[in-house]
Amino acid sequence: RKHKDPYPGGYVKEPKVGMTEWVTSFDLNSLYPNLIVQYNMSPETLIRGGDDFTVSGVDHYLKNAVTDEPRQRNLSVAANGSMYSKEKRGVFPTIIIGLYEERAVIKKEMLRLKQENENANTAELKREINRLENTQQAIKILLNSLYGALGNQYFRYFEMVIAEGITLSGQLSIKWAEQAMNTAMNNILKSDDDDYVIAMDTDSLYVNMGPLVDAMKPKDPV
């Protein structure tokens, strides 16, 4: 594939038209960084070669499990069919895990200082809280930027196959979440394959909880 060829992005479901009173949103936390770690995606872990790369696609993996052969070879398979060795953790997943752990420590300390500030309420504490907030936000941006760099032809480790593997695996994840949500709602409400997900965008889905609220609310509310 040429450097300037486009590749699929995040999945966006056309929103259902109309007003919905009870809507709940669900978000897949740090979707792209977590996918890089899950599949061990990194330039040096990518299996290169014609026979090892079989394009399957999101719709295929929504209905079919990965065959046993990749598992036996200790490989992960992304939604575009690209394969990655899991013999050793890749450089990119290692970077992401390190940043993720660092951000968790910073957020924990920030929460502690916020609780302390409720009693003390000093300018020094507020400055430190702001510093920690800015630091964790910077790390969040850094985590999310790695995927974008992989799809940038001017990046030293540019790899279109990995970038596409991330976005299509993201589509697969959010569509799996949609299926699971609709299955759960239909089972609870005894409905027949109704679609309760009214909108989706990349890593988020929005669910119509109105029928569930109506089914659970008392007949004579106070």
Question: Whereabouts are the PLM-identified features?
Answer:
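Conserved acidic
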Residues: R1-V222
